[in-house]
Amino acid sequence: MTETRGARATEAFFGRRKGKPLRERQAAHLENLLPELKIDLEHAAPADLKELFPVSVERVRLEIGFGGGEHLIHRAAEDPATGFIGVEPFVNSMAKLLGQIEAKAIRNIRLHDDDATQVLDWLPAASVDQIDLLYPDPWPKRKHWKRRFVSEVNLDRFARILRPGGVFCFASDIDSYINWTLIHCRDHAAFEWTAAGAADWLAPFAGWPSTRYEAKARREGRSSAYLSFRRS
């Protein structure tokens, strides 16, 4: 436990953040629906994470920082056999996703509305099949690069919770962050970049739904990279 606290002491903490005022229905979703879907970190995680879900699932996938929720809701709807855990501290984004979950009657999503490292440290070892980190905050200034979510400490966390053969997927339109992630994963013994050629990282992931972040990057003339790393 001391080791975990020490690691966290060097990390930037991202708590609940709020933007523009919520609509009445969005506020109601946060008050009534979120408590039903939120994972309870006060109790130990079940040895089998499939027990977190009210429906039968065959595998578990974690998305860190789901933003507008387009990707998470699309994946959950197209793949009901997978249980999804979505983490997002931004209140407005969480409220938006909750509305989509209700509208589409999605039952294979559980949520956390605070720091993702709390979830990473809570999850059992070798319990997750895939981790998605898509268009994370790039912290573009060099002096802030240490705040990027991809770090040796967090890759250790990923390696602990991913099953052997599990996948870490990363997408970004910021060249310095793409290179940063490639270097960090190359230097980590637990991860192997799966790309065999340029098409493997320039083309979106299979079944990828376009997101507003990706669309913004294209409008501003930036191309994206889609990196996959296999847990050894």
UniProtKB/Swiss-Prot annotation:
Record keywords, A-Z: Methyltransferase, S-adenosyl-L-methionine, Transferase, tRNA processing
Keyword S-adenosyl-L-methionine attributed: yes
EC number(s) reported in the record: 2.1.1.33
Active site: D137
Domain of life: Bacteria
InterPro entries: SAM-dependent_MTases_sf (IPR029063), tRNA_(Gua-N-7)_MeTrfase_Trmb (IPR003358), tRNA_methyltr_TrmB_bact (IPR055361)
Top enzyme class: transferase
A molecular function (GO) term: tRNA (guanine(46)-N7)-methyltransferase activity
Catalytic reaction equation(s): guanosine(46) in tRNA + S-adenosyl-L-methionine = N(7)-methylguanosine(46) in tRNA + S-adenosyl-L-homocysteine
This protein's pathway: tRNA modification; N(7)-methylguanine-tRNA biosynthesis
GO cellular component terms, semicolon-separated: tRNA methyltransferase complex
Positions annotated to bind substrate: K141, D173, T211, R212, Y213, E214
Binding site for S-adenosyl-L-methionine: E63, E88, D115, D137
Entry similarity comment: Belongs to the class I-like SAM-binding methyltransferase superfamily. TrmB family.
HAMAP family xref list: tRNA_methyltr_TrmB
Job of this protein: Catalyzes the formation of N(7)-methylguanine at position 46 (m7G46) in tRNA.
UniProt protein name: tRNA (guanine-N(7)-)-methyltransferase
Organism, as annotated: Sinorhizobium medicae (strain WSM419)
Taxonomic placement: Bacteria, Pseudomonadati, Pseudomonadota, Alphaproteobacteria, Hyphomicrobiales
Gene from which the chain derives: trmB
